[in-house]
Amino acid sequence: MSSQIRQNYSTDVEAAVNSLVNLYLQASYTYLSLGFYFDRDDVALEGVSHFFRELAEEKREGYERLLKMQNQRGGRALFQDIKKPAEDEWGKTPDAMKAAMALEKKLNQALLDLHALGSARTDPHLCDFLETHFLDEEVKLIKKMGDHLTNLHRLGGPEAGLGEYLFERLTLKHD
């Protein structure tokens, strides 16, 4: 059934939004996995766990915001299967942070692609929505993760348990 409120909202934009929702669901699921991995008794890095669980919550808010916009524009949300996280054992903090950075770059590229599609379809509402709620936050998060990776390497690299502990205590407790 077609929406009575749909106006200037192309079907390819609608499909791209549904794909982005799926990517955000997958990211939230991955960050939840990361968060609870670092909460395990044999890993026990509370600050790292908290950092990733906060990201899971932010991604949840992101996909809900996208779904709400989809409904407001007269689009239809089509849910897809969510892929299992790539790992069950995430290793040390630098490995997990690198995986998270790759995920954020993938999300950022998907947002940029959707913005370009919105521009090509002359959809200023979509472009403004993405600029207001997503694009700037993604860039800030990628920068923050890059800073965290730099500090982790300064503290002794991926094999330095004390460096990982100090990073967790001194950096992530202040976020």
Swiss-Prot record:
The subcellular location is: Cytoplasmic vesicle, Autophagosome; Cytoplasm; Autolysosome
Which stretch is the leader sequence? none
The protein's predominant localisation is: cytoplasm
GO MF, one example: iron ion binding
Alphabetized SUPFAM superfamilies for the sequence: Ferritin-like
What is the recorded function of this protein according to its Swiss-Prot or TrEMBL entry?
Stores iron in a soluble, non-toxic, readily available form. Important for iron homeostasis. Iron is taken up in the ferrous form and deposited as ferric hydroxides after oxidation. Also plays a role in delivery of iron to cells. Mediates iron uptake in capsule cells of the developing kidney. Delivery to lysosomes by the cargo receptor NCOA4 for autophagic degradation and release or iron.
Q: Which family does it belong to?
A: Belongs to the ferritin family.
Task: Fill in the subunit field for this protein.
Answer: Oligomer of 24 subunits. There are two types of subunits: L (light) chain and H (heavy) chain. The major chain can be light or heavy, depending on the species and tissue type. The functional molecule forms a roughly spherical shell with a diameter of 12 nm and contains a central cavity into which the insoluble mineral iron core is deposited. Iron enters the spherical protein shell through pores that are formed between subunits. Mutations leading to truncation or the addition of extra residues at the C-terminus interfere with normal pore formation and with iron accumulation.
Protein name as it appears in the record: Ferritin light chain
